[in-house]
Amino acid sequence: KQLGYKIQFIFDESDNISNPSSKQTLSVLSCFRRCKYKLLTTGTSTRNNISEFAPQLELLYNNSINMISWCRTLYSYDKRSADMEHKENPYYGMPIPAYKKGYRLFANSHLPEKITVFGVGQRNQDIYNADELDRLLGKTVITRTFEEVTGKDIRRIHQMPIPFLPEEREVYNIVLKEFYRIQREYYSSTGNSRKDALMRLIQQITLLLRISAAPDCMKEYEGETPLKEMAVVEALARWPEEVVAIGVRHTAVLDPYAAAIREYLPERPLFVVTGSTVTFAKRRALREVLRGSRNGILLCTQQSLPSSVNFEFVNKIIIPEMHYNNAGMSQFYMRFVRYTSTEKKDLYFPIYIGSLESNLMQMVLAKEKLTMFMKGQDADMDEIYAKFGVDYDLLSTLMTRETDDEGHLRI
């Protein structure tokens, strides 16, 4: 206020204000929305849904005549019947309102429902009023892709579809059909029965995805080394002279992979890195140690690698445990895909077919379609499938959520 808002504001990683309810978003908006000169930079303006872009628009335009709602029709889903409803836009020709009212209007104008692991197979993820959104993006967003800047496309994505072994399917079915029996072994009660009931499905989904990453992280598993871990070990054995990076999301999944690599490839140097066990300074020093190993294996949690350290000499990356969107995973694998890279980078996604992981992959692809649209690259799902190396019928492997005779949700 003392400067009359005559300041220049540059905001890197502006997608950090994608959550309109967070204190960070509210603080940034209250401090800088009236600044005269603003530049927002980010690798991806949205991660999960289009409405995440609304706070960034609000920061740029401050709900002025530069962000007018030109969508004549608003869309929403009826929660009971799941039917699409539409109505006239009461704010047509007016600036989009501030805060929650504006975020709701923005979502209902373009994508009225979030993409979920079950919704990907039930509803298409088309963008409504796409021309109006494209017109707004056209005057707001300037996009330069990695390929445009470097003049080369060095990323190659490979899918590794893997079937369940009987013992792996057995532990998967325990969580699927008898979750009530083992729930308290993995999740503590909140002390509130209503909250416990609301959390049950989320906890079940989380555990199913954990099993899909490493079945032997469950004590109910009674088989040998799971097939996915063996597929990763066999891939490592095919690259005896390569430095390889493996990224998971949870330490509970990391431990089984570390044990399998030590058992089957004891001669290969193994570097295990997590944010909680290795200091930041050691993680930065890891770069030269890994390069000097010649054929070392970096096994880490995806969020543990500091963004200031790059490993451009690593050409093989395996991701056995996926994030909920490609933006989250790219924060990890782009540590290895750099502007200075000269060799091709191979990304591998081992996936258990017929598990909830298939739904997760389809959700990642659906979100990637939205992300590409926000960057001015309107692509259909066939192009997205080709980009991610999906050459099998992914939709036929999706799991569904149903309501039983007693009104309980079941997967």
Model-based region annotation:
Residues 151-171, 176, 190-309, 378-411:
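Conserved Helicase C-terminal RecA-like lobe
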Residues 18, 268-359, 367:
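Conserved RecA-like P-loop NTPase helicase motor core
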Residues 2-105, 322-327, 336-338:
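Signature of the SF2 helicase/ATPase Hel1-core->accessory helical subdomain module
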Residues 22-34, 66-217, 239-241, 364-366:
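Inter-lobe coupling linker of SF2 helicases/translocases
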Residues 49-60, 172-173, 257, 310-311:
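PAPS/PAP-binding and catalytic site of the sulfotransferase fold
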Residues 324-333, 337-411:
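A conserved SF2-helicase RecA2
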Residues 15-17, 28, 44-47, 60-62, ...:
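Short, solvent-exposed loop/turn segments at secondary-structure junctions
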